[in-house]
């Protein structure tokens, strides 16, 4: 097939085959593709949280306090870094991310608290092919089981697709079941395991790989917007319906 019927649904599009003049099967055309635009280190405002460009002087102290709320460092087992124990360590750790030109790093600001409670980055940014990864996800106990974590990731995904990216990636240690559940909950598709991808803290790490495509974003976005709506939460901040409820209702 040499054309692309615009009326086809995503499921139908996946069944379309394209062939060149040698009768070889080729990929679908991407008309007018000129690459994605680089995400900026700029503020992304939400109802429950705000993503601010990461700044060691502005955010390190609050992040240290938030991370130290945990009684131990088990949340850091599968992360690249160890939990900072002092302000100097936290400042240096944050500054390294800020100075890394391959990252677009953000502090997650809890709007109710007015202070940083976690951080997250865009990484592995490939503008030419329209691919980037959400990584360095480092939530504190002040974000766990709260709406801020989901909204922060929705803000990032929305920003990526608004900048013209075709694919947003998520990867995690194969042992990190919480990260895997988070990706699947948000609508990412599991693509497989990359065996012996790296050595992390002296141990082998296999990585689980997930992606969300621009064609899948409208459905995921609709579900996330519905879940994040104030009408879905009690006065105490308890969800009335899980995100899976809205994902099941979103049109394909």
Residue ranges and their predicted role:
Residues 9-12:
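Serine residues within intrinsically disordered or low-complexity segments
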Residues 182-183, 210:
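Conserved active-site tyrosine of GNAT-family acetyltransferases
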Residues 189-203:
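Conserved catalytic-core motifs of GNAT/GCN5-like acyltransferases
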């Amino acid at each position: 097939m040499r054309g692309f019927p615009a009326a086809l649904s995503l499921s139908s599009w996946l069944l379309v085959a394209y062939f060149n003049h040698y009768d070889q099967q080729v990929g679908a055309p991407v008309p007018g593709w000129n690459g994605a635009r680089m995400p900026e280190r700029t503020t992304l405002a939400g109802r429950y949280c705000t993503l601010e460009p990461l700044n060691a002087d502005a955010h390190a102290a609050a992040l240290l306090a938030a991370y130290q709320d945990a009684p131990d460092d088990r949340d850091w087992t599968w992360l690249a870094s160890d939990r900072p124990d002092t302000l100097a360590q936290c400042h240096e750790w944050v500054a390294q991310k800020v100075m890394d030109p391959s990252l677009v790093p953000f502090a997650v600001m809890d709007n109710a608290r007015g202070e940083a409670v976690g951080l997250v980055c865009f990484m592995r940014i490939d503008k030419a092919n329209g691919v980037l990864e959400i990584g360095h996800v480092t939530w504190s106990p002040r974000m766990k089981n709260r709406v801020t974590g989901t909204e922060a990731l929705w803000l990032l995904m929305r920003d990526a697709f608004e900048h013209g990216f075709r694919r947003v990636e998520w990867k995690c240690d194969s042992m990190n079941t919480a990260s895997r559940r988070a990706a699947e909950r948000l609508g990412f598709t599991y693509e497989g395991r990359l065996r012996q991808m790296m050595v992390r803290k002296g141990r082998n790490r296999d990585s689980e790989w997930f992606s969300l495509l621009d064609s899948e974003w409208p459905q995921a976005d609709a579900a996330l917007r519905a879940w994040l709506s104030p009408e879905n939460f009690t006065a105490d901040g308890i969800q009335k319906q899980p995100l899976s409820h809205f994902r099941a209702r979103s049109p394909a």
